[in-house]
Structures are given as structure tokens and as C-alpha cells.
């Protein structure tokens, strides 16, 4: 077993005792840091940065040099799988991700194969291996993927969407086509995350960014059942240690019980749910991750500390089973010093809850 100097994040996910609440931030390696912008400029563009193991490791470690974070997260993108399936991902200025060959019909779905994690996606595994080496056992490394539903939204819409009309048209007019796509994606995510674990990821997270646009019935049919399949297919022990799995559905507060029933170790919360309510509903079954509004990082240091204190109080005295995080990714124009206030406030203010 690889010795970790700080394993609080892993212990909290498994509801084991810790001496303070561990914290990391979604998108903690990113554009709010000037050093990230410099490294990205050196790489040339976003995907070139992802595909260079040394530079991907550099940007993964940058926030850890600034802040006493309790975990590192692989620097990559959720759209690596569809890109490797041949949909030709590019990032257009002002538009975000665009697929030049989107999925439009059943024939398109039948044509795509499962990418080889050590073939078309080997650059991701190389980054995992490099990051683990460079971390030198300081903190655990989180691997991740998008959920099948969320990946499918980009693949069918051809990029980002506000109304999701194309994928919902497929969902209601050709549900069997969408299920075929989601099933392929679930198999691909299982292979991809298991390869990340074998390469060195010590925990994995599935981001279901767009699950919250579905009706309760459709959420279960088109998103949750495929995340359940992923949880069932993942390696859960590696290098002598359990590999915790976190599921996160943005705007998924109404489905916490169903998410917890998948067999995951932790459920990610966005800021639209009260953490005390979430704990009352599922805290006996899983750990919780979250859940400060990322926009709170625009506030004064005093207000940030006040918000952290309120969330810690909401989680309460039984201080095991909470990983502090934002409710979604940090915004690109947040002052880095405010992120530092946040991280240090979590450590300082959580200690009384862990006596």
C-alpha cells in the first residue's frame, strides 16, 4: 500500500474519523490561477494541455502549492470519451465545447466503439501516472468521468445546450436509440475509470452535470440506472485500500435517496439543498460532499468564513462522513486569495466538530 501523508479525504468518504473536515474544490486547477493561465499558454490550447502528462501534472499540483487542500483531482475533461469515440471535439472561442460529428441517429450510435483506455485515451492514464509520481504521497488523487447522460447530452446536442431539445427529442421519440448510446457510454466509463484506478487514482467521481434537467421518471430511466451500472462495475479495492466512489448530480437534491441506493460511498451536493436536510435523509448510508455556492467566493473573507461555519454547523457534531467542497466548479474570476480563505476556514472551523 502506498503511504499517504494526508489521507483525511479518503477516510471522510468512508465515514471514518478525521481530526478536521477535509476540503478540495471542483475545478481547483483552473483559470482563476495566473500560473494556470501561463501553463495553458505554454501548451497552446486546452486539449494540448490535457494530452501533455507533464503539463497536466503541473496544473493539477498548482492549487496544492497555494492552498492546504486535502486532495488533488486529475486535470482532464469529461468529454475525453466522446472525443475518443471519433466525434472530433474542439473548443470554440466563446462557445465552449463543440463536436464536429455529433450523434444524430441510430446508425451513428451503432458505429461508435468503446475507446481503449490505454489506446486512444492513454494520454489520460499517462497523466494519472505522472501526477501520482509528482504528488509523492502528499494527498490522494481523484479520477473522474462524466455520467453517461451528461456525455450523451453533449454528443447529441453537438456541444453545450440550454434547452436540450435534440437529446430530449431522441429520448421521447427514439428511446431505444438513446438507451443504446447510454449503455455504450456506461461500459466505456467503467473501463475508463477502472483504468484510472489501475494507473493510480485513489478515488473516483462521476459528474452528472445535466441530470437535473430531467423529470423524476426520466432521471431514473436515463441517468441513474446507468450510474448504478457504473458503480457495480468499478474496482473498489486497489493497492490494499478501498477506492471510494462519489456520484454528483447537479440539481439532484430531490433524488438523494435513489443516488445513495446505488452503492456509492459518497453523494455530492450542490448549493440548492441544505446539508442538514441531506444528512437527515441519507447521512446514515453515505458520506456527503459539498456544498457552498461557488459565488460565495466573491464575498468578503468574513462572509466566506460565516458561510463555511454555517455549513459545518448544518452537518453537525457527528463530524465523520463530510468532505467540504463547493456546490459546483470555482468561477474563473474568483480572487485566488478568497479560495485560500475558504480552505483555511474549513480546516480551522471544523476542528471542534471532530473532538
UniProtKB/Swiss-Prot annotation:
The keyword Cytoplasm applies. One of its GO terms (cellular component) is cytosol. Gene3D superfamilies: 3.20.20.210. The record marks 77 as: Transition state stabilizer. Substrate binds at residues 27-31, 77, 154, 209, 328. It comes from the Bacteria. Pathway: Porphyrin-containing compound metabolism; protoporphyrin-IX biosynthesis; coproporphyrinogen-III from 5-aminolevulinate: step 4/4. Keywords: Cytoplasm, Decarboxylase, Lyase, Porphyrin biosynthesis. Its EC number is 4.1.1.37. It catalyses: uroporphyrinogen III + 4 H(+) = coproporphyrinogen III + 4 CO2. GO terms for molecular function: uroporphyrinogen decarboxylase activity. InterPro entries: UROD/MetE-like_sf, Uroporphyrinogen_deCO2ase_HemE, Uroporphyrinogen_deCOase. PROSITE patterns: UROD_1, UROD_2. GO terms for biological process: protoporphyrinogen IX biosynthetic process from glutamate. It is found in: Cytoplasm. It is an enzyme of class 4 (lyase). SUPFAM superfamilies: UROD/MetE-like (SSF51726). HAMAP family: URO_D. Catalyzes the decarboxylation of four acetate groups of uroporphyrinogen-III to yield coproporphyrinogen-III. Belongs to the uroporphyrinogen decarboxylase family. Homodimer. This is Uroporphyrinogen decarboxylase. It comes from Vibrio campbellii (strain ATCC BAA-1116). The lineage of its organism: Bacteria, Pseudomonadati, Pseudomonadota, Gammaproteobacteria, Vibrionales.
